[in-house]
Amino acid sequence: MIEVFLFGIVLGIIPITLAGLFVTAYLQYRRGDRLDV
């Protein structure tokens, strides 16, 4: 049961982490683009 629980946690954390990195990179890109313009 512990392995299944940890596996579920990992499957839940990975998409959230990827989404967070994507949003952060997008905001930095927009911010840099605004500064250039």
Swiss-Prot record:
Its main location: plastid. This is Cytochrome b6-f complex subunit 5. Pfam families: PetG. The chain crosses the membrane at residues 5-25. InterPro entries: Cyt_6/f_cplx_su5, Cyt_6/f_cplx_su5_sf. One of its GO terms (biological process) is photosynthesis. It is found in: Plastid membrane. It comes from Cuscuta exaltata. One of its GO terms (cellular component) is thylakoid membrane. One of its GO terms (molecular function) is electron transporter, transferring electrons within cytochrome b6/f complex of photosystem II activity.
